[in-house]
Design a protein with these regions (language model features):
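Membrane-interface helix-entry/capping residues at the boundaries of transmembrane alpha-helices
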Residues: 42-46
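Membrane-water interface segments at the C-terminal ends of transmembrane alpha-helices
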Residues: 47-76, 92-97
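Membrane-helix entry/capping segments
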Residues: 1-7
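Alpha-helical transmembrane segments of integral membrane proteins
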Residues: 8-41, 57, 80-168
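Hydrophobic alpha-helical transmembrane segments of membrane transport/permease proteins
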Residues: 1, 69-88
Length: 168
């Protein structure tokens, strides 16, 4: 149990970085995909999200190590010293959750955009971008925040596997 307590701060740091990365990428991606529904951007982003949901953390971790550590030499393949060493583990851990958050945001935005109050605000002459940012996105984030809260526990569990793959 002492070993667990020694490694727990690193687990928390990895989980926080992965969640931050997932939210910063996924919420705008899902919102834009909803606004540009049935376009090439929407299709590509949702295919990437589907791949993200389907890909196991250990497999993505190995692919990231092969590409960014061994081939390109941009990031260290193991260790937990410095900021560069947390990038690949955070991407590997956050990618699956990023996909889920993007899909939830898109779905919630599509539902919100179709609400009567959004049509009313648009009929009053408010610019579409303002309607999306101030009215639709704010209300669409309620289910997204719920999903984010639930995924924190999954990330804490998944970080053990990520730490093993990256010898972090």
């Amino acid at each position: 149990s002492e070993e667990v307590f020694n490694r727990f701060p690193n687990t928390i740091k990895l989980t926080a970085c992965a969640m931050l990365l997932a939210v910063v990428v996924a919420v705008p991606l899902g919102a834009v995909a909803a606004v540009k529904q049935n376009t090439l951007f929407d299709s590509i982003s949702m295919v990437i999200a589907l791949i993200g949901v389907s890909m196991p953390i250990f497999w993505l971790g190995l692919l990231l190590i092969l590409l960014f550590s061994l081939k390109l030499g941009l990031f260290p393949s193991s260790g937990s010293e410095g900021i560069k060493s947390i990038v690949l583990p955070a991407v590997a851990l956050g990618f699956n959750h990023m996909a889920s958050i993007a899909r939830t945001t898109r779905s919630s935005m599509l539902e919100t955009i179709r609400q009567d109050y959004i049509r009313t605000v648009r009929a009053k002459g408010v610019a579409y971008g303002v309607v999306i940012r101030k009215h639709a996105l704010k209300n669409a984030l309620i289910p997204t925040i719920t999903v984010i809260g639930l995924q924190i526990g999954y990330m804490l569990g998944g970080s053990v596997l990520t730490e093993t793959v990256f010898a972090w």
